[in-house]
């Protein structure tokens, strides 16, 4: 212990005597360790921590599969699954919904869920107050009840301890509060959910051919495996198909662990980020190893004297490693402070669509990770220089043979190897960043098929209790006319299906198309729109015409389709043809009056879930179906000014028609589009930042290596210049030495990049993982940086006075 304390005191004294080296080393480590700790804190919050439910590994999410792919669950099928399963301890259905909360205070749109009895018990959660939904409340005709979140209880009802049994108004209906959920409870979507109502009382979810966004939560019995559950549910699905062949042909059950379902989409991006910061730290370690090798050469006399006084190699290695560990621990402390600052930035501006990211914090796990990383980093960058510096030949050293000659030869290969590895890692990181930047630029530049500029969007939901008959149509048409009279407004329209927000789809049959088997009908995104919709959105007309004010109920039923549907099912000649819809209560065939351009509805990455689109005129919808088609509408307002500045005036028009209607999801279409690619923006900007840091470290490392080489070869350069060598040849000599190292590293890096970038393939859009232009561009950039890093010490070498150089020691 005494000798260790002595080593620490000596190391501190040595580092204090070299403030320049110590500062550079600590700052380099702080950047590398801090970046790793910050990303680990995000990974820890999002991926590592278990889901906040008892035995979360037993929780599964079930969805239906069909011949067309995955879909939501039919409610009657859910009931049959529940009755037929023996390996699941419990099973419950839920679907996302939202509700107008009215009564005391301003009307407010509440994010909510419809859940079946047993849903809360399946999660293993008990209410803070009250009780869960009972089976008697989860059926047709039951009195409406609601469970509310702790946040809503506090915000809207001031934490009223007598809230149970009181009524709140949701969508125009009185609901009795039966439970307040725990303060720390989170829905597994990790999005805010404030109200939970029984799903079984909802009439529109009870039809077997209706798939209204339901997913099924289930808990495996102890001892049951996922494979056994999948086999059992395949048998159950086959029995349902046999009983209902027309409606369940080809339908199965997809079972995924809840954690995988919730976090699976973000895991690849976060793993890539963690790998990127790991590469930055390795580059930093290589840099510091080179610095320590240079210091080791300069300290050979000191080490020789210590050997002569009896210090063994083990003691010397321990002393040198102590210095490295002190540097890494100091860098770790600064890195932890940097990580805490970065974490606060993430919490203040959390990227959208990354679950639990707002829970990121510097906790005991992050502190432990940082400490471990600091120790490992100190060993990684300090061990090789310590072993090399302590492996001196005592006799040769005392004779002075080790200085510039043998010492330099011993260190040269290791230093060059480290430099090659730095450039290899840097090129791999730069290629990855460049590919992601190109992919993001491609998504950002996608033409969505309409003009999103100066276009305001908002959502309005009508409560069924107050809007029967023609009232929905009358309301929307009045609102359209009133909003159109506002200053700077150029056009107003409404639709049931806003891009990047909602996803209504409909099966169809094209004229002349053979009736397919059940489950094989084509799907199209279904837009119910007002007159003027295409002009407001500026969707181009390809052929025919769009809806006019004269297209109303009682006239011929018209439909407008997109060019994809026209090309696939009508060979581009669709005008005058008809589209019909399967089902007994479906409308009669509709005549195609127009073909418009395809619009991007789901994602800017080019992977449209449903490639076809069709449009119906809302005024043509028969009166009994007006509420069903228009219970929720997105209002679109095109303006000549700032769309967000217009929002209060439009909201006032809604309140003027019905003061109990909340207006929500108020965004410009540009903001809505930007939000849809927020996760890609987050990961791309981070990797680009790490790549820039890696490039800076690599350039600094090469500069240091060449500068050290020049200092060691000062006498040689002086001799060359004395013998008549021109400055140009000296420049070429020094720059060439550095370029050889850089090009060797880039060669290794290119080979590594070809293998590594394949892991990015799923995150790339519009560019391949082996894009030649990207690889070539990065190689040219790195070559230019290498030339600059070598040119500065090379210029210094050409200014050496030959007489001074000949006397250089």
Regions found by a protein language model. Give the residues of each.
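Extracytoplasmic/periplasmic
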Residues: 69-90, 466-490
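Membrane-proximal juxtamembrane linkers immediately C-terminal to transmembrane helices
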Residues: 39-64, 84-87, 126, 189-192, ...
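Mid-to-C-terminal secondary-structure elements
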Residues: 98, 112-135, 144-271, 344, ...
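Short, strongly hydrophobic transmembrane alpha-helices
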Residues: 18-46, 50, 283-285, 332, ...
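Membrane-helix entry/capping segments
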Residues: 1-24, 53, 67, 106-109, ...
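Alpha-helical transmembrane segments of integral membrane proteins
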Residues: 1-22, 258-263, 291-318, 322, ...
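Small-residue-rich transmembrane alpha-helices
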Residues: 42, 289, 325-397, 438, ...
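Interfacial "coupling" helices/loops that link adjacent transmembrane helices in transporter permeases
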Residues: 284-328, 700-739, 746, 759, ...
């Amino acid at each position: 212990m005494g000798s260790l304390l002595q080593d620490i005191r000596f190391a501190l004294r040595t580092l204090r005597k070299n403030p320049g080296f110590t500062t550079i080393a600590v700052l380099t480590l702080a950047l590398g360790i801090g970046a790793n700790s910050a990303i680990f804190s995000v990974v820890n919050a999002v991926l590592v921590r278990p889901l906040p439910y008892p035995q979360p590994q037993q929780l599964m999410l079930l969805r239906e599969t069909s011949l067309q792919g995955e879909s939501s669950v039919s409610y009657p099928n859910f009931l049959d699954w529940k009755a037929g399963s023996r390996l699941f301890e419990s099973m419950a259905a839920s679907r996302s919904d939202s509700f107008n909360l009215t009564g005391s205070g301003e009307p407010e749109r509440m994010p909510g869920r419809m859940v079946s009895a047993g849903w809360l018990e399946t999660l293993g959660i008990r209410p803070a107050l009250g009780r869960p939904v009972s089976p008697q409340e989860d059926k047709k005709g039951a009195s409406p009840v609601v469970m509310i979140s702790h946040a809503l209880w506090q915000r809207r009802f001031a934490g009223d301890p007598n809230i149970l049994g009181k009524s709140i108004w949701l969508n125009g209906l009185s609901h009795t509060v039966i439970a307040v959920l725990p303060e720390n409870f989170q829905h597994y979507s990790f999005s805010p959910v404030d109200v939970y109502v029984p799903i079984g009382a909802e009439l529109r979810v009870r039809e077997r051919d209706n798939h209204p966004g339901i997913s099924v939560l289930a808990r495996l019995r102890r001892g049951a495996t996922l494979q056994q559950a999948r086999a059992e549910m395949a048998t159950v699905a086959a029995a349902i198909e046999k009983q209902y062949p027309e409606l369940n042909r080809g339908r199965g059950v997809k079972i995924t662990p809840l954690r995988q379902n919730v976090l699976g989409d973000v895991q690849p991006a976060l793993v890539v980020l963690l790998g990127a910061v790991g590469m930055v730290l390795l580059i930093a370690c290589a840099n510091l190893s080179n610095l320590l090798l240079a210091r080791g050469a300069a300290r050979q006399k000191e080490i020789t004297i210590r050997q002569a006084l009896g210090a063994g190699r083990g003691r010397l290695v321990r002393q040198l490693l102590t210095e490295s560990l002190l540097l890494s621990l100091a860098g770790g402390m600064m890195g932890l402070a940097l990580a805490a600052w970065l974490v606060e930035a993430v919490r203040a501006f959390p990227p959208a669509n990354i679950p639990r990211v707002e829970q990121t914090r510097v906790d005991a796990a992050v502190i432990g990770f940082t400490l471990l990383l600091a120790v490992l980093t100190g060993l990684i960058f300090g061990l090789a220089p310590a072993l090399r510096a302590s492996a001196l030949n005592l006799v040769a050293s005392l004779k002075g043979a080790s200085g510039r000659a043998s010492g330099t030869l011993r260190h040269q290969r290791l230093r060059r190897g480290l430099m090659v590895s730095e450039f290899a890692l840097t090129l791999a990181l730069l290629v990855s960043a460049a590919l992601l930047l190109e992919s993001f630029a491609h998504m950002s530049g996608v033409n969505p098929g309409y003009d999103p500029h100066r276009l305001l969007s908002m959502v309005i939901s009508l409560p069924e209790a107050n809007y029967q008959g023609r009232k929905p149509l009358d309301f929307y048409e009045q609102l359209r006319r009133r909003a159109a009279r506002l200053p700077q407004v150029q056009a107003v329209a409404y639709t049931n299906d806003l891009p990047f927000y909602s996803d209504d789809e409909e099966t169809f049959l094209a004229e002349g198309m053979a009736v397919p088997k059940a489950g094989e009908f084509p799907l199209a995104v279904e837009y119910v729109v007002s007159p003027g919709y295409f002009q407001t959105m500026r969707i181009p007309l390809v052929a025919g015409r769009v809806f006019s004010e004269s297209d109303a109920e009682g006239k011929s039923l018209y439909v407008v389709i997109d060019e994809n549907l026209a090309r696939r099912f009508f060979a581009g000649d669709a005008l005058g043809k008809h589209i019909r819809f399967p089902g007994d209560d479906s409308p009669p065939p509709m005549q195609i009056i127009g073909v418009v351009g395809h619009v991007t509805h789901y994602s800017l990455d080019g992977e449209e879930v449903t490639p076809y689109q069709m449009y119906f005129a809302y005024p043509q919808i028969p009166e009994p179906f007006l509420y069903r088609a228009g219970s929720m509408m997105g209002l679109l307002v095109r303006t000549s000014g700032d769309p967000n500045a217009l929002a209060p005036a439009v909201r006032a028009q809604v309140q003027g028609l019905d003061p109990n209607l909340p207006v929500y999801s108020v965004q410009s279409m540009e903001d809505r589009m930007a939000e849809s690619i927020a996760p890609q923006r987050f990961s791309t900007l981070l990797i680009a930042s790490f790549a820039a840091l890696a490039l800076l470290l690599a350039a600094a490392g090469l500069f240091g290596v060449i500068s050290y080489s020049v200092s060691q070869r000062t006498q040689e350069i002086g001799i060359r210049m004395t013998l008549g060598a021109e400055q140009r040849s000296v420049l070429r000599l020094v720059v060439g030495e550095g370029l050889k190292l850089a090009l060797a590293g880039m060669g290794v890096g290119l080979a590594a990049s070809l293998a590594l970038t394949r892991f990015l393939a799923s995150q790339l859009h519009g560019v391949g993982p082996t894009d030649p232009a990207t690889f070539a561009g990065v190689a040219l950039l790195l070559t230019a940086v290498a030339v600059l890093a070598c040119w500065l010490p090379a210029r210094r070498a050409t200014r050496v006075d030959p007489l001074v150089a000949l006397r250089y020691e």
